[in-house]
Amino acid sequence: MIMAELKIIQVRGTIGARWNQRESLRTLGLRKIRQSVVREDNAQTRGLIKTVHHLVVVEEV
């Protein structure tokens, strides 16, 4: 079975963000604005994205 993948791009900084939002970005592997990562599309990743949806842009790969 082929798992779908998501490309996650950080578009806003973490200044003023809550602690759990910063930790979610770090868990996703994002540290800088315009940095992107590719992750599997699963429930854990979707939950992290939901926490920081206003700081990132998500595309299906």
From Swiss-Prot:
Domain of life: Bacteria
Pfam families: Ribosomal_L30 (PF00327)
Keywords of this entry: Ribonucleoprotein, Ribosomal protein
Keyword Ribosomal protein: yes
GO biological process: translation
GO cellular component: cytosolic large ribosomal subunit
InterPro entries to which the protein is assigned, alphabetical: Ribo_uL30_ferredoxin-like_sf, Ribosomal_uL30_bac-type, Ribosomal_uL30_CS, Ribosomal_uL30_ferredoxin-like
GO MF assignments: structural constituent of ribosome
Keyword Ribosomal protein appears in the UniProt entry: yes
Assigned protein family: Belongs to the universal ribosomal protein uL30 family.
PANTHER family noted in UniProt: LARGE RIBOSOMAL SUBUNIT PROTEIN UL30M, MITOCHONDRIAL RIBOSOMAL PROTEIN L30
NCBIfam families according to UniProt: rpmD_bact (TIGR01308)
Subunit text: Part of the 50S ribosomal subunit.
HAMAP family: Ribosomal_uL30_B
Record protein name field: Large ribosomal subunit protein uL30
